[in-house]
Design a protein with these regions (language model features):
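Mid-to-C-terminal alpha-helical segments outside catalytic/metal-binding sites
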Residues: 2-7, 30-51, 214, 219-225, ...
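Hydrophobic faces of well-ordered beta-strands that scaffold small-molecule active sites
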Residues: 7-11, 52-55, 80-83, 105-107, ...
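Conserved, mostly hydrophobic/aromatic
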Residues: 10, 44, 68, 127, ...
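Divalent metal-dependent hydrolysis catalytic cores, especially in the metallo-beta-lactamase
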Residues: 25-33, 38-61, 78-84, 102-110, ...
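Short, acidic/polar
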Residues: 34-43, 88-97, 175
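Active-site gating/metal-coordination segments in enzymes
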Residues: 62-141, 148-151, 191, 195
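Catalytic pocket-lining loop regions of alpha/beta-barrel enzymes
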Residues: 117-225
Length: 293
């Protein structure tokens, strides 16, 4: 049987020896949390993961994207990126990032609050015009408040970590219901990621199983992707990569659905595989403003 091809759609890189952290950083990853490009490559190679999406971290670097861009440039199309930018970033600056392999920018309301993005309408509209992505991270019911801004802009939206649901609040929590509603939008994709961050239980994180299955039902495997969240910030002990990858077989038992989640959907959404050269030249698989998938 042919091995399943894999794209990891949520990893971070930290290389403070080459790219020092900002002095005003929210958090300075250290020790087991460090994820240099060399370490990332070793982990991905060991588990047969062909591509990855590098999500610019607010921890350590914030709007300093030099480490991210250097890693993208050195990887010859293996990676795509999500940059952290100011709300005032111009369309020309976004286009430069796109040409460097950046697929979109982060909207981290979980850390910065929904109010931080009150003046981000222009940024989101420019992302939409360039067919780039808003990589959204929310907690609790923040998506309910953030949704109108995202919908008005027409931007493609990728939601991190299953929407970071509270397992104790259940499937009926307002924020999770809002995320399920987004399953009807052709512009939205959800990342089946962050199990270690969100779960209240040890591996295999069975308290998240109903949430993952509800998301796959709502979005379909053509608008779900998988991510590890390596190198697992703020964890009290080292987290093993391999078990998180194999856990998806329990969460999504259907092999064809897993194939689409692990490969087909991320290759399409991030312009990987055969589309690498076109994206590197600043072109996109989707027509600007068109709905993905």
């Amino acid at each position: 049987m042919e091995a399943q091809r894999v794209v990891d759609c949520h990893v971070h890189v930290f290389d403070p020896q080459r790219f020092p952290y900002r002095p005003d950083t929210f958090y300075a990853p250290a020790g087991q949390e460090l994820g240099t490009p060399a370490r990332l490559r070793t982990v991905l190679d060991a588990h047969g993961v062909e591509h990855a999406l590098l999500v610019g971290p607010n921890s350590g670097y914030g709007e300093d994207n030099r480490c991210l861009l250097d890693t993208l440039a050195a990887a010859a199309g293996r990676y795509r990126g999500m940059a952290v930018v100011a709300n005032s970033t111009s369309r020309a600056e976004l286009a430069e990032l796109r040409a460097a392999g950046v697929s979109g920018v982060t909207v981290n309301a979980a850390l910065l609050g929904v109010g931080y993005y009150a003046d981000a309408g222009g940024l989101l509209a420019d992302l939409a015009a360039l067919d780039m992505i808003a990589d959204v991270q929310v907690v609790d019911d923040q998506l309910v408040e953030l949704a109108p801004l995202l919908e008005r802009s027409g931007v493609r939206v990728h939601v991190d970590h299953c929407g970071r649901p509270d397992p104790g609040a259940g499937l009926g929590a307002a924020g999770f219901r809002e995320l399920l509603r987004w399953g009807a939008s052709a512009r939205a994709v959800v990342k089946l990621s962050g199990c270690v961050k969100v779960s209240r239980e040890p591996y295999p994180h069975r308290d998240l199983l109903p949430f993952v299955r509800a998301l796959v039902d709502a979005f379909g495997p053509d608008r779900c992707v998988w991510g590890s969240d390596w190198p697992f910030l703020r964890m009290p002990e080292r987290v093993d990569y391999g078990p998180l990858l194999t856990l998806l077989a329990e969460q999504v038992p259907d092999a064809d659905a897993r194939r689409r989640i692990l490969w087909d959907t991320p290759v399409r959404e991030y312009g990987l595989g055969g589309g690498s050269a076109q994206v590197a030249e600043g072109q996109c698989e989707h027509e600007p403003g068109a709905a993905p998938g």
